[in-house]
Swiss-Prot record:
Disulphide bond pairs: none
Stored Gene3D superfamilies: 3.50.30.30, Zn peptidases
Cell compartments where the protein resides: Secreted
Binding positions (Zn(2+) 2): 271, 304, 430
Site note Transition state stabilizer, residues: 429
Active site annotation, chain numbering: 303
Gene from which the chain derives: LAP2
Subunit structure: Monomer.
Name of the protein in question: Leucine aminopeptidase 2
Family: Belongs to the peptidase M28 family. M28A subfamily.
A Pfam family this chain is assigned to: Peptidase_M28
Cofactor(s) the protein needs: Zn(2+)
Biological role stated in the UniProt entry: Extracellular aminopeptidase that releases a wide variety of amino acids from natural peptides and contributes to pathogenicity.
Bound cofactor: record note: Binds 2 Zn(2+) ions per subunit.
Amino acid sequence: MKTQLLSLGVALTAISQGVIAEDALNWPFKPLVNADDLQNKIKLKDLMAGVQKLQDFAYAHPEKNRVFGGAGHKDTVDWIYNELKATGYYDVKMQPQVHLWSHAEAAVNANGKDLTASAMSYSPPADKITAELVLAKNMGCNATDYPEGTKGKIVLIERGVCSFGEKSAQAGDAKAIGAIVYNNVPGSLAGTLGGLDNRHAPTAGISQADGKNLASLVASGKVTVTMNVISKFENRTTWNVIAETKGGDHNNVIMLGSHSDSVDAGPGINDNGSGTIGIMTVAKALTNFKVNNAVRFGWWTAEEFGLLGSTFYVDSLDDRELHKVKLYLNFDMIGSPNFANQIYDGDGSAYNMTGPAGSAEIEYLFEKFFDDQGIPHQPTAFTGRSDYSAFIKRNVPAGGLFTGAEVVKTAEQAKLFGGEAGVAYDKNYHGKGDTVDNINKGAIYLNTRGIAYATAQYASSLRGFPTRPKTGKRDVSPRGQSMPGGGCGHHSVFM
């Protein structure tokens, strides 16, 4: 009773000073958030209306996408800001920043046969260069992986172990005039070099099947490749949107995030309109409750160009401010059409990549969400290839949900989750077909309820959660092994 009277007194004082929003007037009388009630506020119609809104933003402009710095993305962040500001429940801000945008297209022809290829973003241009193809050894991550005759040649490199940028730089150092990276799992390959670097060679990605075929041809004879890469670059102003509950303990912050941008090819509705709307729907539902711990939501810009927005945000916080963030939950692609229910492997039991202390407990909480309903789930590699990367590098516990990108579903997974074996989790990943029709309604609804479940648990109490590790730096680069994807920038952007 004393606490209630104190809260009411604070509210009345604020009213007398004329500085409190209408929603906050009701704060002392709202029930404390709990998992069941918050989940029950999640409605499929709201989720589908939200992703439709994002598609409308994209299609209102000639580019038909929501790439950072573009009109469709600006409409997206303005809408998120205005919707949450209108609730009166959150302190909302837009965080401006400038990043280098790149658009690249590639054409690759080998021995007279055209191959499907994607230029790596930030690749140097190549004007119809023609040269003999040579093979890099051991994934091309070290200078010794390149044969002496690499100079003046185009080099074929298998994906894995190190970043695309490292491979391209090593190829450039070896005086290759071009680099082609082929996938190490079935399917096409698109990605980024992570930024401009004068060491980079012009670089494109191709499928595993095409890459293996080229490697076989090189081993048995000469292969001549013609490669064309067109690249454009432009500095663009863009924004993160950050919203934090006005109530709750602001020294114990629960943070959730999703990236709000798309690739150039389409509107990006599963990747990552699904996560964007998932956490927004939870944020709106949360306004019906009070919280013990403050909840902060982040919508990150420029994820598709190298996790730029989330990295900018984390870098803007000193150790004292970041220490207030007790955990970070990431949601990137939660409506994949051929989905699998996947939880980031916080304890490292599946992929030997553990998160900071507390990441295991986040994984176990999501496991309980699925287990309590008898719903199957599996771990996904916690490699730091989505927006949680900047957080775990600074020792913030992290976790989240993911329903799959371009990795092909196995027969065993099809038995477990349904869907079609031999087909990617999202066959429209990074394509123009990533529209509202690409969303699996059951997946986005279930996983958004999972977001609500975790939000309610941690917003009400952190009892039993490990003491927040000291803010510091840690290496999250997965070297020496190849892992399936764990998100959007996740699977194919860097490595």
